């Protein structure tokens, strides 16, 4: 092992520790945050603090973006981890004197620092490892992060049983201190990362306003966040009614987060890739709103803690596994000049906007009905889930059109080995066929007409005798893809028709004039091309 490989191995080890600790701290922190807030305030105050947290988070993201334009992540993020660790100590000290204020401060603290630190950590990882080796290492780090989610839930539950909530705050501070040290030990980037000063938030909004596909992506993220806000309120409303003291709430939330962490990890590991390969991006994304709609109806009919646990658990499990992995693939068709400035806006700003809308809707419902029934909130979640399903249908169509257009124009390149979903595989095959068809037609026309003359009807009807096998196949492909009924029929009747041109016969099944003839010829080849027909 050379020195560079040894250094990378050490960096990876620290990254694995940091990822596990970071997500464990986040999950344990969420359990503590929820328990502390609900033990000091009625659940009807939850939308207010969520709105404040969303606004604070957006402000934090904008500030961090500005700082990262002048300070590298490896220098800035450890400092932010250290600051967060100190804030937990401050909240530990304040809790005995002002528990209400402390619970609000903790909520805002986690909202601002949570997204910033996770995003900053992945920026460090992306810069630290070279692109060639990054894919495999990132997969290992992501697995460590998933494991951290499970550990965090278990720790929150077990720690709450042996000590009070105040001591848990010191425990959370210690975890972020470990993150500060391990993240700093990951090391500096292996390559210089240029900062594009032309990329600004204003340009991102301009790009989104001019691209319908991006608008549908943003709309889906907003609706998913609204669903999450409604489902989370319904879940916590029932939980606060069943558990009265903060220690019981921490233990309950810790067990809940640990369970969804385990189930989400298993689902993504065992079925995530298979579902994408079998059903494509659209169907995979649709699983989340469909689950909310079904479980929401059950929750409306039977409003109990267990139905709300099922509803919230389904939402969390599918959001953190299938939805996230499939939604990330929606960026595939976008050229870099559109992807870079808009991804943060869609991923973060749209999510926070959804929090604001969802919490605003809850405040409106609470104004109308102060003793808001949980069933009403679940009904609203079902309605939003139905809207999300409609957006998924539109977005899937947009993805297909955008990817096909980008591939044909050559503005994006996709390595076939990197494709994990059925939708992209199908579009790549169609676009490759399109490019190959255009290339063949141009070559055939150039060979047949060196002086630029065009075919006449008499030329087309003439029998063409070519002894070269490749030339015969090329002419058959040219005829099959010409759009001319006479030439297509001539190709379908050619005795040289075989599996080598089957790919070009399949699209004819959608041609009303040629369906029967194409089907008749393909049935003789079907046993030899099962993969192309599925």
Where are these regions (language model features)?
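Intracellular loop-helix junctions on the cytosolic face of multi-pass helical membrane proteins
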Residues: 1-12, 16, 43, 47, ...
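Substrate-agnostic recognition of the 12-TM MFS/MFS-like secondary transporter fold
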Residues: 11-64, 102-160, 198-207, 216, ...
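A membrane-interface helix-boundary motif in multi-pass transporters
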Residues: 72-76, 155-174, 255, 279-284, ...
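C-terminal ends and interior cores of transmembrane alpha-helices
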Residues: 82-100, 290-304
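Alpha-helix initiation and capping sites
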Residues: 268, 428, 432-437, 469-473, ...
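C-terminal transmembrane helical hairpin of 12-TM major facilitator-type secondary transporters
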Residues: 283-322
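Structural detector for internal amphipathic alpha-helices that build alpha-solenoid repeat scaffolds
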Residues: 457-467, 475-478, 486-497, 504-508, ...
């Amino acid at each position: 092992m050379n020195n560079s490989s040894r250094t990378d191995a050490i960096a990876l080890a620290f990254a694995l520790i940091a990822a596990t600790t970071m997500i464990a701290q986040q999950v344990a922190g969420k359990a503590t945050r929820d328990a502390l807030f609900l033990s000091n305030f009625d659940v009807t105050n939850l939308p207010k603090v969520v709105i404040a947290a969303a606004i604070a988070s957006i402000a934090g993201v904008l500030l961090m973006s500005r700082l990262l334009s002048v300070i590298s992540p490896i220098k800035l993020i450890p400092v932010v981890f250290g600051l967060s660790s100190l804030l937990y100590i401050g909240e530990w000290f304040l809790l005995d004197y002002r528990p209400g204020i402390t619970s609000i401060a903790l909520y805002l603290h986690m909202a601002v620092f949570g997204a910033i630190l996770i995003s900053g950590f992945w920026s460090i990882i992306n810069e630290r490892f070279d692109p060639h080796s990054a894919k495999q290492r990132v997969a290992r780090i992501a697995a460590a992060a998933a494991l951290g989610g499970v550990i965090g839930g278990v720790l929150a539950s077990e720690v709450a049983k042996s000590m009070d909530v105040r001591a848990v705050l010191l425990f959370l501070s210690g975890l972020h201190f470990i993150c500060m040290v391990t993240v700093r030990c990951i090391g500096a980037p292996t390559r210089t990362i240029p900062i594009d000063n032309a990329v600004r938030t204003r340009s991102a909004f301009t790009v989104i306003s001019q691209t319908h596909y991006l608008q549908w992506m943003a709309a889906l993220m907003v609706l998913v966040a609204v669903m999450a806000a409604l489902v989370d309120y319904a879940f916590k409303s029932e939980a606060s009614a069943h558990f009265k003291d903060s220690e019981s709430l921490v233990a309950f939330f810790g067990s809940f987060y640990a369970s969804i962490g385990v189930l989400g990890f298993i689902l993504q590991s065992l079925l995530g890739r298979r579902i994408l390969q079998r059903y494509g991006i659209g169907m995979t994304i649709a699983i989340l709103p469909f689950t909310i709609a079904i479980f929401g109806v059950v929750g409306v009919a039977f409003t109990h803690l267990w139905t709300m646990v099922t509803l919230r658990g389904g939402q969390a499990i599918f959001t953190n596994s299938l939805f996230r992995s499939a939604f990330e693939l929606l960026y595939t068709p976008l050229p870099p000049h559109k992807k870079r400035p808009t991804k943060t806006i869609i991923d973060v700003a749209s999510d926070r906007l959804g929090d604001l809308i969802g919490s605003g809707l809850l405040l409106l419902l609470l104004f109308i009905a102060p003793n808001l029934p949980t069933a009403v909130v679940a009904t609203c979640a079902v309605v939003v889930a139905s809207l999300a399903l409609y957006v998924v249908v539109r977005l899937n169509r947009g993805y297909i059109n955008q990817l096909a257009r980008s591939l044909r124009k050559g503005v994006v390149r996709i390595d076939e080995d990197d494709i994990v979903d059925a939708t992209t595989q199908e579009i790549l095959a169609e676009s490759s066929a399109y490019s190959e068809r255009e290339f063949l037609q141009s070559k055939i026309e150039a060979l047949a007409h060196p002086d630029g003359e065009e075919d006449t009807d008499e030329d087309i009807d003439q029998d063409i005798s070519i002894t070269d096998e490749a030339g015969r196949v090329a002419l058959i492909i040219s005829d099959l893809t010409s759009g001319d009924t006479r030439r297509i029929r001539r190709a379908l009747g050619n005795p040289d028709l075989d599996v080598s041109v089957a790919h070009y016969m399949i699209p004819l099944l959608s041609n009303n004039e040629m369906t029967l003839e194409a089907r008749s010829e393909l049935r003789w080849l079907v046993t030899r091309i099962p993969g192309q027909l599925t």
